[in-house]
Amino acid sequence: MTDHGRTAIVMSRLPRLVDPHALWLRGLRAALRRIQEHGGTVVRIRQTAGSDFIQRGAERLGLPVDVIADGSSTAGNDASDTDIHTVRDRRVMSAADTVLVLGIRAQGNIHRALVEYLASGGRVELVDLPGLQPSTVRDELIRLGASTWPPSAEDQAPFNGTSDAPVQSHHSMSVYEIVPFPPPDQWVFLSHSTRACPGPWPHQSFCDYADSLLDELPDADHSASATLARIVAQRRVISSPQSNRGQHPVVCLTEVPLMELPLLRQYQVHRTRWDFEPFGVCVDRDWLQSRGARPVIYGDEATWLQLSDADRPYFQLCPAQVESSGDPGPKTDWRIEREWRHVGDLDLQHLPRDKGLVFVPTFEVAMRLAGISPWPLTLAPAPIDAI
């Protein structure tokens, strides 16, 4: 790499949920340190894959960053998202002296742009980590003139070192306890299923989120399991206005017994995620009701118009096709969820041990939560698609 050169770091589109141990993150740390070592400048365009992480990583290392115009206006008014991304990828490469390549997909925008860039005499270095690029793509780019750079373990290391310490709490179970969940005819709980949290945690800034990944901190894991651990450790379920007409922040629960929960599990295409993951907390219905939780009011537009402001946070449009007419897929009758809602965050600080239950899919996950949960743990029934 030329000293004091302008360097672009490129990669294919990232998954919504970032794995804190992902190869591209290791490669990104290494690439930024390489630019720092050579006194270079980072070149980036907003809204390209990983651009915000590149920006934050450069800030952490004190690297100068040149943010250039994305050139999307040159793609034309009728340009597709693919066309716009292609313009941006080509533009950031043309503005750089060297392009450092992380993960790429075969025949993706980055792959095609790199082939063109190499044909024009551009300088390309592949960050050489096993599995970071498909071998066929890697071999092709090398034949076209790309070089490889194998970063050391030190290059890839978290910026501030890593901590494998588990989340701690001043409350803990002295005995690891797995209990059977009550049968449907004895079910007295309302259940809240947790799911992964792509992007920052509620009330977390993007900078803090990016730092947790660059530093490989324990809270960088935003999986459904980690979300549940966070709820248990904080003794609080954070409310959300998502999927709530009127944008009222609520916590959603279901009175469907845990044994029957897998029957509700389905993939929501418009949200690109599954509903009713096998992670969550069950809370005694009477305890919740005494704190304001109420059953959802299912109805149509006429029902909504008749509701008071106090009742509207509990409204759910039904039948679903009235609200989802643009969705060509099958419609859901939300009444099968038998939903309850709690307006605002749900504080579990004073939930008695016999009024709560934590459900997880495996013994391994249960063992990780045993040290922080004041409530017993149970194994959730397997999802229908996993049987």
Residue ranges with predicted function:
Residues 1-172:
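Glycine-biased, small-residue-rich flexible motifs in mid-sequence functional cores and linkers
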